[in-house]
Amino acid sequence: MVPEAELEQTEAGLVPASSGWFVMNARDARWFDKPKQGHSLPLTGYDEYEAETFFPMLGMSIRVMGPGEPTGTYHWETEQEDFLVLAGEALLIVEGHERRLKQWDFVHCPPETRHAFIGSGDGPCVLLCASSRQFQKDGPWGFYCADETAARYNASSPEDTQDTDLADARFPPSRPMRYREGLLPD
């Protein structure tokens, strides 16, 4: 029988403290303020320890970004990634092309698909992000990419690199935070 996981209450919200099944409301969980990139709820681990210890097979997060805010730096990963727009609108930069997205649009990125999302429209965009972690242990996770189209939206790395510090140098560090009322739609 699979045990129920313990959830630990931190200053920023709930986080898993042991392996097992659990139920956790997104509004009670630990969020991160990502200056110039909106907000993030890493549902399956924020760092390597949490991901490998509690969620070795699947990565999943909720991203909330305002108009003009990228989710991060244009990149590709060795794993499949999938995305669902839960609310609002976004601009997808994929393989150097722009695609407008609206609520309930689903985006599938096979391994090595270069991509980034930018909030658009009149209000916040809520994006569900999911990826496999099956092969990340066998080699590099992926690559940050320099791209003209992504650069127009502050979503490009200055050069192709695997160095997160270099790729994200234009963004202030993320900070853990409690859920802020209004981030998620009712």
Regions found by a protein language model. Name each.
Residues 1-57, 152-186:
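A short, N-terminal "cap"/entry segment at the start of jelly-roll beta-barrel domains
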Residues 39-48, 61-77, 111:
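Conserved short histidine dyad/triad with adjacent acidic residue
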Residues 57, 62-67, 75-94, 132:
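Short, conserved beta-strand element in jelly-roll/cupin
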Residues 82, 96-112:
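Short acidic-glycine-tyrosine-enriched beta hairpin
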Residues 88, 104, 117:
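Short hydrophobic/aromatic patches on the structural cores and recognition surfaces of FHA
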Residues 91, 111-138:
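Ligand-binding loop in jelly-roll beta-barrel domains
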Residues 132-162:
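Surface-exposed, gly/pro-biased binding rims or lids
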